[in-house]
Amino acid sequence: MIEFNKDNLKIDMEIGLLPFDQGSIAAILYPECDVAEKFGVEGLKNSDIVFSVIVYADRSFLSAQYTMDQDGGEEHHGYEPTEAEKELMWQLLENCSQQKYGCTLEKFPAVFQRMSQANHEVALN
């Protein structure tokens, strides 16, 4: 089985907080490998899936899933990453937080909320 690594898994530089749980961070990741082989789904193409993770900033939780576009509908499937893949995902999230938002992943929820509030206030004026 293919294992995600720094060469075949990239992050969308837009991470955010889930509206129903402001401590949860969500991100979209882009596999750059044979996803049919990776997820064991014959005929699956990279353009057919969205791979996402939800984490808690304190590193107490990481959940991964992929959503397949099939026959006009969506199928959601949980994915249990290996320990090495989990560490890679944490690194991708940490790097994104530091590069785009100038803070550690642990501080990201508070920084993101302040930025969102400031943007909301500007939009109202």
Label each PLM-derived region with a short phrase.
Residues K6, K86, W90, E94, ...:
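Residue-level detector of alpha-helical secondary structure
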Residues M1-V41:
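Negatively charged, low-complexity tracts enriched in Asp/Glu with abundant Ser/Thr
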Residues Y101-G102:
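Charged, low-complexity interaction regions
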Residues M1-E3, R114-N125:
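Short intrinsically disordered terminal tails
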Residues F20, Y30-C96:
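Acidic, low-complexity, intrinsically disordered interaction modules
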